[in-house]
């Protein structure tokens, strides 16, 4: 499903006024857009896209600065997940080619080393689980200790839903940031996942924040949600107030319920990037999975000039990403400095 709802028909003058109002509100005062204002941005005609992206870039530069945060991710435990997230090839409930596997500690350390060599300040350890059991928590603790002995990098984790005790344990071993995506608007969530609730995810995020870890929470666009629901999602994230929002775009995976969905049109994806920046002016907004197939090289450049200030380099969990060298070359071409580790501690 692409753009839906009743669009404004008053022409370029109204669109210009909308952008002028957004410039005053977000750029000058640092106040994020409301749901209805985000919706207006998503409804802008394509001939206003360049102006929208320019405004989002100005907002990013004003409230976040020119630096770009680089992150690498690694799957500690792949596949065999009991949850039914309809976009995910790691679910054990679907006829996916992905099979369950564990990464050994030595390989985890080597991956962290390679990530650090790319200039990254963040290394995220991910596991395909509903939530971690004792074995996984022990493996994560051992992996983090091994990485810290050899690599200077911030460590993040994404291990599903947590208990209070697990949150405290991760905080205690020095996890810098915890990722748990809400994935989509609350009103659309049951179309994406049925084995747990949106509220359960929110609860984990609240506990993470209370424990003093940074919160990383975003989602996937292009899963059949309406444009109204994209605006709803942006404001739900603004209410949560995460330190980082990773924006993924659906890359339909064979064997999953969403495997036959169409890829999101590039103009919609770029409008979404800009609109989310205007809703979240001070948040780290990260290009994540699906940008390669959705936007290509040109769209990646437009996104970096349209509100994005962080990227995941290298491959994702079960799909190929852009080579790290390509992203680093793009940042160099755009004269965007990479955030240094000592600036992020």
UniProtKB/Swiss-Prot annotation:
State the needed cofactors, names only. Answer: [4Fe-4S] cluster; [2Fe-2S] cluster
Q: Where does [4Fe-4S] cluster bind?
A: 81, 85, 88
Q: Which GO terms describe its biological process?
A: biotin biosynthetic process
Q: Report the EC number(s), separated by commas if there are several.
A: 2.8.1.6
Q: Which residues cross the membrane?
A: none
Keyword Transferase tagged: yes
Reaction catalysed by this enzyme: (4R,5S)-dethiobiotin + (sulfur carrier)-SH + 2 reduced [2Fe-2S]-[ferredoxin] + 2 S-adenosyl-L-methionine = (sulfur carrier)-H + biotin + 2 5'-deoxyadenosine + 2 L-methionine + 2 oxidized [2Fe-2S]-[ferredoxin]
Q: What does this protein do?
A: Catalyzes the conversion of dethiobiotin (DTB) to biotin by the insertion of a sulfur atom into dethiobiotin via a radical-based mechanism.
Q: Which gene encodes it?
A: bioB
- Give a GO molecular function annotation for the protein: 2 iron, 2 sulfur cluster binding
Protein origin, superkingdom: Bacteria
Protein name (database record): Biotin synthase
Detail which positions bind [2Fe-2S] cluster: 124, 157, 216, 286
Source species:
Mycobacterium leprae (strain TN)
Pfam families in UniProt: BATS, Radical_SAM
